[in-house]
């Protein structure tokens, strides 16, 4: 088992099925067809910060940040003053470097059914300063997924933890480019040094690879450590 260690800031997410790991909803057990081809990563578009989330009818963390004049700073690996987060990299997955699609890096499955559309779990990390209520951050965490086109999920999700810190998780399905996809998000709040760091873990895969995503999410839930 490989690991990547990082100085963390704002958003964390996670997946779960029937109370375990990232809240992933499944209607039937999928059948996967692994290949040995190295995938060309095609992640769901992810905002570099929570305040850049797409608008929609459901109130989001981005709306809370805007309406309360909170300052948000993107956090990258090695930034001074940020917590240390150790996220596991499950077998048959590999690291994703930081990029516009993976602002704080992430992981990608190396044996996908479609090499051009592999399952991914992408991280975003932010530092919030100002008049912040961590409970409000978690309260509005479900809004981003619920604003996805055709999203169907398990209500508003459920309270959780990651590495000993409070979190909120939600999962379900939505449609993109005519294909049904599984999506899940875990948002973690990490109070540290007069600020609140938010870690978002965004998981996304074609519906047929839901179980692959869930297995990776279970590893993340069980083995992640966070040191403020």
UniProtKB/Swiss-Prot annotation:
<dbReference type="GO" id="GO:0009274">
    <property type="term" value="C:peptidoglycan-based cell wall"/>
</dbReference>
<dbReference type="GO" id="GO:0005576">
    <property type="term" value="C:extracellular region"/>
</dbReference>
<keyword id="KW-0961">Cell wall biogenesis/degradation</keyword>
<keyword id="KW-0843">Virulence</keyword>
<dbReference type="Pfam" id="PF10738">
    <property type="entry name" value="Lpp-LpqN"/>
</dbReference>
<keyword id="KW-0564">Palmitate</keyword>
<dbReference type="GO" id="GO:0005886">
    <property type="term" value="C:plasma membrane"/>
</dbReference>
<keyword id="KW-0732">Signal</keyword>
<comment type="function">
    <text>Involved in cell envelope biogenesis. May act as a membrane fusion protein, connecting MmpL transporters with periplasmic proteins, and play a role in cell envelope lipid changes during biofilm maturation.</text>
</comment>
<feature type="signal peptide">
    <location>
        <begin position="1"/>
        <end position="19"/>
    </location>
</feature>
<comment type="function">
    <text>Is also a virulence factor required for intracellular survival. Associates with CBL, a host ubiquitin ligase, and probably blocks the normal functions of CBL and disturbs CBL-mediated antibacterial activity. Interaction counteracts antibacterial defense but causes a reciprocal enhancement of antiviral defense.</text>
</comment>
<dbReference type="InterPro" id="IPR019674">
    <property type="entry name" value="Lipoprotein_LpqN/LpqT-like"/>
</dbReference>
<dbReference type="GO" id="GO:0071555">
    <property type="term" value="P:cell wall organization"/>
</dbReference>
<keyword id="KW-0472">Membrane</keyword>
<keyword id="KW-0964">Secreted</keyword>
<comment type="subunit">
    <text>Interacts with the periplasmic loop domains of the mycolate transporters MmpL3 and MmpL11. Also interacts with secreted cell envelope biosynthetic enzymes such as Ag85A. These interactions are weak and may require a putative mycobacterial adapter protein or molecule. Interacts with human ubiquitin ligase CBL.</text>
</comment>
<feature type="lipid moiety-binding region" description="S-diacylglycerol cysteine">
    <location>
        <position position="20"/>
    </location>
</feature>
<protein>
    <recommendedName>
        <fullName>Lipoprotein LpqN</fullName>
    </recommendedName>
</protein>
<keyword id="KW-0449">Lipoprotein</keyword>
<feature type="region of interest" description="Disordered">
    <location>
        <begin position="26"/>
        <end position="53"/>
    </location>
</feature>
<feature type="lipid moiety-binding region" description="N-palmitoyl cysteine">
    <location>
        <position position="20"/>
    </location>
</feature>
<feature type="compositionally biased region" description="Low complexity">
    <location>
        <begin position="28"/>
        <end position="52"/>
    </location>
</feature>
<keyword id="KW-1003">Cell membrane</keyword>
């Amino acid at each position: 088992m490989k690991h990547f260690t990082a100085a963390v800031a704002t958003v964390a997410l996670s997946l779960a099925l029937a109370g375990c790991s990232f809240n992933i909803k499944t209607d039937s057990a999928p059948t996967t067809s692994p290949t040995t081809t190295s995938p060309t990563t095609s992640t769901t578009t992810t905002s570099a910060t929570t305040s850049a989330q797409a608008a929609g009818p459901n109130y989001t963390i981005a709306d809370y940040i805007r309406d309360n004049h909170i300052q948000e700073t993107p956090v990258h690996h090695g930034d001074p003053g940020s917590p240390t987060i150790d996220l596991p990299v499950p077998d048959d997955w590999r690291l994703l470097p930081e990029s516009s699609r993976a602002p704080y890096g992430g992981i990608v499955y190396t044996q996908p059914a479609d090499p051009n559309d592999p399952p991914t779990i992408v991280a975003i990390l932010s530092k919030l300063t100002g008049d912040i209520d961590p409970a409000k951050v978690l309260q509005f965490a479900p809004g981003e997924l619920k604003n996805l086109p055709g999203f169907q999920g398990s209500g508003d999700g459920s309270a959780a933890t990651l590495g000993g810190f409070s979190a909120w998780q939600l999962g379900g399905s939505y449609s993109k480019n005519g294909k049904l996809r599984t999506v899940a998000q875990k948002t973690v709040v990490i109070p540290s040094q007069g600020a609140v760091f938010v870690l978002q873990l965004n998981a996304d895969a074609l519906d047929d690879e839901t179980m692959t995503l869930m297995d990776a999410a279970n590893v993340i839930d069980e083995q992640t450590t966070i040191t403020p």
